């Protein structure tokens, strides 16, 4: 039985770092484990131009622990009125590495998102031309579509057509949650990749609803039936090269989760690697963990892999019920549980 696992330092290809006091409280957890992270732009107001994204990057760098080598990889928030030249300039100058498509009202901070993907086709055509990745929250938002079906309907109605119209556009189908999404990505061409969160590998929708409403298991896209969780585990641990680590860590204050209308999002950053490696251990795929965590993402984003290493060891670690993040109480994923792996050297 493997007792230690040494891998290249991973990257997290989907994080929410928030801003101000909460940013300062949560960013150390990501920076401790990961060399780089794709930072979501859905602040209030959202990061819709070069100047705003650059200023946010500066705030993240200022919030890092002293001596940290962590690099935030920034993204642009797309709207119906996004300027094509602003997109091209920010990408060329290295201010952001990708653009994020939120269908309007699909999730937290998406009110300014795109109302119809055809509205931004000229922007997407420019992105295809310059090789800029598009990151997609893949759900429809029609009120008549069941929340558990929104990802599958998005594939059928929007994503399939987009890929046909722009076959060279580099797309990351983020935080996939369904068997349909796993099959779509596996069957697509080399321009399509996906991220998978730790929660969607560990829990199904029962975690939210059995024995009472469990707000800390609520995120968007919501966890689905057990067959979907199993399909995601199969894909993540298969060695498939176009799927990679993206936590979608989404911190919210405890009292905002435990409310009549609680926020969507799971704060998984503090024990992200421990959570992921547990899945690979359970699936007998520890030999494939480095590819998922450290190699596949850089390959898709056309970035070098990290040279330094991180060591994980088989040893119990207790996850606290609550974490004080610079004055904000936040409940982490796996709260109150004991995980079987921990970071030995980072």
From Swiss-Prot:
Residue sites binding substrate per the record: 16-18, 42, 137, 220, 252, 264
One Pfam family it belongs to: Amidohydro_1
Alphabetical UniProt keywords: Hydrolase, Metal-binding, Pyrimidine biosynthesis, Zinc
Pathway: Pyrimidine metabolism; UMP biosynthesis via de novo pathway; (S)-dihydroorotate from bicarbonate: step 3/3
Catalytic activity: (S)-dihydroorotate + H2O = N-carbamoyl-L-aspartate + H(+)
Native source organism of the sequence: Novosphingobium aromaticivorans (strain ATCC 700278 / DSM 12444 / CCUG 56034 / CIP 105152 / NBRC 16084 / F199)
GO CC list: cytosol
Descriptive protein name: Dihydroorotase
Biological role: Catalyzes the reversible cyclization of carbamoyl aspartate to dihydroorotate.
